[in-house]
Amino acid sequence: MKRRTDPECTAPIKKQKKRVAELALSLSSTSDDEPPSSVSHGAKASTTSLSGSDSETEGKQHSSDSFDDAFKADSLVEGTSSRYSMYNSVSQKLMAKMGFREGEGLGKYSQGRKDIVEASSQKGRRGLGLTLRGFDQELNVDWRDEPEPSACEQVSWFPECTTEIPDTQEMSDWMVVGKRKMIIEDETEFCGEELLHSVLQCKSVFDVLDGEEMRRARTRANPYEMIRGVFFLNRAAMKMANMDFVFDRMFTNPRDSYGKPLVKDREAELLYFADVCAGPGGFSEYVLWRKKWHAKGFGMTLKGPNDFKLEDFYSASSELFEPYYGEGGIDGDGDITRPENISAFRNFVLDNTDRKGVHFLMADGGFSVEGQENLQEILSKQLLLCQFLMALSIVRTGGHFICKTFDLFTPFSVGLVYLLYCCFERVCLFKPITSRPANSERYVVCKGLKVGIDDVRDYLFAVNIKLNQLRNTDSDVNLVVPLEVIKGDHEFTDYMIRSNESHCSLQIKALAKIHAFVQDTTLSEPRQAEIRKECLRLWGIPDQARVAPSSSDPKSKFFELIQGTEIDIFSYKPTLLTSKTLEKIRPVFDYRCMVSGSEQKFLIGLGKSQIYTWDGRQSDRWIKLDLKTELPRDTLLSVEIVHELKGEGKAQRKISAIHILDVLVLNGTDVREQHFNQRIQLAEKFVKAVSKPSRPDMNPIRVKEVYRLEEMEKIFVRLEMKIIKGSSGTPKLSYTGRDDRHFVPMGLYIVRTVNEPWTMGFSKSFKKKFFYNKKTKDSTFDLPADSIAPFHICYYGRLFWEWGDGIRVHDSQKPQDQDKLSKEDVLSFIQMHRA
């Protein structure tokens, strides 16, 4: 229930407030020279006497303290100086109730703090009160005028080199050895002094800053930061994806000078690449994701914690990549600065690329220079040289090279770039948007290795030997190309200076931006998500999360790969070749044949050593293959497990090998509908990609040698009688393959590769084969699409000529059983029907 206000009672109160207001007005007009304390005490005395008279008039008891508080609150609101005018009346009244007087502290003796408590300037996890001397100063760099972030990038190439590639005689006195130099501030030959000192100063500012605080600010400041690694192993993979796109896929789809692709997925040649100083392997994971089993990689990196992490290749098949660590092979140390390792890796790569070398080399070397960031270029000079040397050692003529560099201020580093400029058709220095703008990282990109670079390679090899000799001494190689030679090429020098100064300007702005973002934690780049989406779309990278490949049992994976095909097909057994069935092999040009060494099986690869076999009967299960080998996931093959032999007598060695008869799915690529010849060609390409010459402990994988039926006599030339270990000294029939290993043959598979109603004939007029349709009577020299026999037709219609007892296919064997098909019978039939 509300209490009614009595007008007579409220009148004295209004009168009292009027008097207080008048007094407050007089106090507020007090001179600024008058001490605040006298004003306060005067006010207090006046209010005390005033409150006493008013309480008697009202006839109601009021304590002097309560009125004193009310007066002080009102005086704070209306009569205090402008120093406190920013605070609202409520907060001022609260302070007044606690006894606050302007210019005095709280407490009985006014001993409290007199000044206002400042807002906290605490940053991150720094200790309370910690200030970083040197960091909190202003950099005086305007970073806000940086260009708008964009996914589009421009490439600026060095002008084409018109001078001859230097030879041994010319380079004989180029190497200059002098006192070891450990300062960078005076390296102004290829960069303006002011810019150089500015970038070094900006870097030095961050020396006192906590690393985590720096990283958080950098993450907010970089508009491209959210690109990260997507579904790859690390950010390096996305750098390669970025640069591969910018350079028109010159790495994953190299072309000749006429724009024609050098390698095609449907052709036999692999795309060979190498990855050095590259652990854990992000560059290679990207290339293998893009090319799948159409590429083969070789890698060398330092053994240890930064080794290749092939088990973490989630998006690509690491079985297509072969690490080799130089001298000692898989047991080497991978140190690229050791001449023995460079030579060993070069020989290994050439031996496994038909002596041609790789199509391109990627090098991403670097090591921690914590506390010496400004000297990174000097500390990394030998690493840079060895990566350049490796390019000239293993890249094929016309091939490409990409390598990470840091600052390029010293004449030593610029001299190395000059040698690349002489040895490649085109060279450029490029910083991708996936490389953080504040660091000194850049990439030298080289296109089209020239002929005749051997002398430069030998020269760099000699320089590396000298660097190793001078290690831990006060001397060093200071020049690899004389300054007058470099500066004599004005176009090269101008590009080098422009590139360095442009890079310095970019770094300075980026460092200043991070500095500002450290100081103000509310700053952020608003378009990070938008830019990320735009970049992934442009580079052709799906926006997917990184997840480990799901595990699967072989049976489920088999049904997934055959995609609804009738499973009964896989239980078909070949038709035995007899005198009666021999008549069906007409014309002979429709058929191919292969030597059998054991029973046919289906083999499925689920990744790494997860390999299973199945004999085709629905009642039987998939069985784990007890061999040491690896295959990419999503692979389905028709194979034999053959016991191969090498040598004779007691020294004879036996090894189990996988022989491929036909292929269905290769690393997720369904090839069943392609021509048999094409499937065999792709199988050979696949085997090259997965083979591991550096691992003699692994069981080999081979593709059966396929013969035209009309050339069957070539098979019998490869047959001979050999003594098999454990066969009581009795010679047995052996077939020797292309790799000089032999096995005991069980018979011959004969496969029809032309689909009905098409058949093949031989034109005597044109001296070549043609295709003939038995229904339409059409004939053509070009392969008709509907004449191709897919896998299930080839598998269902195959024949098998068993070479058991009573079959004489070699002159040293026992006499022929007259009731069985002889070698002569078959050869005479072929001769009769191929004319």
Curated annotation (Swiss-Prot):
GO biological process, one term: 7-methylguanosine mRNA capping
WW domain residues: 752-786
Classification via PROSITE patterns: G_PATCH, SAM_MT_RRMJ, WW_DOMAIN_1
GO MF, one example: mRNA (nucleoside-2'-O-)-methyltransferase activity
Keywords: Acetylation, Methyltransferase, mRNA capping, mRNA processing, Nucleus, Phosphoprotein, S-adenosyl-L-methionine, Transferase
PTM annotation (Phosphoserine): residues: 28, 31, 53, 66, 91
Domain RrmJ-type SAM-dependent 2'-O-MTase: 231-450
Induction statement: By interferons alpha and beta, and by Vaccinia virus infection.
This enzyme's EC code(s): 2.1.1.57
Protein's UniProt keywords contain Disulfide bond: no
Biased composition (Polar residues): 37-54
Keyword Methyltransferase in record: yes
Binding-site list for substrate: 203-207, 218, 374-376, 439
Active-site residues, as the UniProt record annotates them: 239, 364, 404
Pfam families: FtsJ, G-patch
SUBUNIT field: Interacts with POLR2A (via C-terminus).
PANTHER family for the chain: CAP-SPECIFIC MRNA (NUCLEOSIDE-2'-O-)-METHYLTRANSFERASE 1, CAP-SPECIFIC MRNA (NUCLEOSIDE-2'-O-)-METHYLTRANSFERASE 1-RELATED
Role of this protein: S-adenosyl-L-methionine-dependent methyltransferase that mediates mRNA cap1 2'-O-ribose methylation to the 5'-cap structure of mRNAs. Methylates the ribose of the first nucleotide of a m(7)GpppG-capped mRNA and small nuclear RNA (snRNA) to produce m(7)GpppRm (cap1). Displays a preference for cap0 transcripts. Cap1 modification is linked to higher levels of translation. May be involved in the interferon response pathway.
Official protein name in the record: Cap-specific mRNA (nucleoside-2'-O-)-methyltransferase 1
